[in-house]
């Protein structure tokens, strides 16, 4: 007999069901997962040796948890993943507002119904997906919202005195009894509201409007908070921090590989889009490097963080840029270009908080700086390093390319030009082909033209060529030609 088919308290007792607190439930199921070698927080990448072990220790210790980290560090995702460590179903007294355990009732409603009906008390089953409550801490949250208040309408309808505890309307926290309760952005919660959480965290009981209710709530609290006060927000009051068992610091992905895994998992790409646009591996790496550069940039306030959402939305915009270009050219398939990266600027500008120098430059200019920095960082990994100081007349691997620009006066690369035109223009620069054959002989055919454009952008970043943006595309010239044209 399936346990969730049990419908009365008597049947539940006969089945041998034993009550467990939610913290014991999480602990027990986590122990089984660790023993079996299964991943405990599947789909969360980059925390395997840092955050997840600390989170597992906190759960095994039955602690309430505070996840402390900058924006876009999977804090809420981790909290939501804890649902998977709960039992699939738990019983509760049918009609109970606070999910009363039939074997250990705490509300007056549940105690009264069990006293009247005994083993015939009807019970229902709560699935683990319904045992997750989340509240974003905003300045307008009140004690009544979280804990509860006296309900005058209820008192009038039931003809009850205000001295009767049945007039209480329970808030979110009592209604989340035997559940995981997450409060996001805890510092935004007013200090007086944080004080109201003291008793719940330490003793597990609540007080509503002077009613001395001894309700030992059974809850797993998870808080999320940002460590930096970069807005006009408050802070976590010290006695509340003292009552939170474990504080765990999250972080951004530490490698390009992990960042790529996260972006590819989270980006919402259309199947037709993915089939139409071929994305070279280097393009995906460059996209992730932009976030890494942003976190170190002098133009961006690193205290506010650069969310992993930047790369996710940038990838979506990047493919949409290439898709739009291909549709305008009447092409069924296309390969991503480096010039398509201009389409990701709107995804960057809204997700970085600029310092004074960045504001002076402008958000769009900062976004272009970040792309340039990413190319500058990656270039030496693919081609010989360009030295700042070179001897006069010394031949370098790039001399023939630079000479070609002196001879041909450069070219224009339009944003919406067809693949045929794009390949014709880059194919006309023969020294690019020679350089790739020498230093990237294993390069796939599909990646060749992206790599050619990458070389040109790299030479621009190392001040060997110049690149100017105009309304319809880019103009590449030798460094002196660009200087003369500006006179």
Whereabouts are the PLM-identified features?
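Conserved ASCE/P-loop NTPase catalytic core
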Residues: 2-257, 268-285, 298-303, 383-487
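Amphipathic alpha-helical interaction surfaces
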Residues: 58-61, 84-88, 203, 293, ...
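Short alpha-helical scaffolding segments that buttress acidic/His motifs in well-ordered protein cores
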Residues: 263, 287-291
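C-terminal helical "lid" subdomain and adjoining coupling/linker elements of P-loop NTPases
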Residues: 273-280, 293-370
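Extended alpha-helical coiled-coil/bundle linker/stalk regions that scaffold oligomerization
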Residues: 335-423
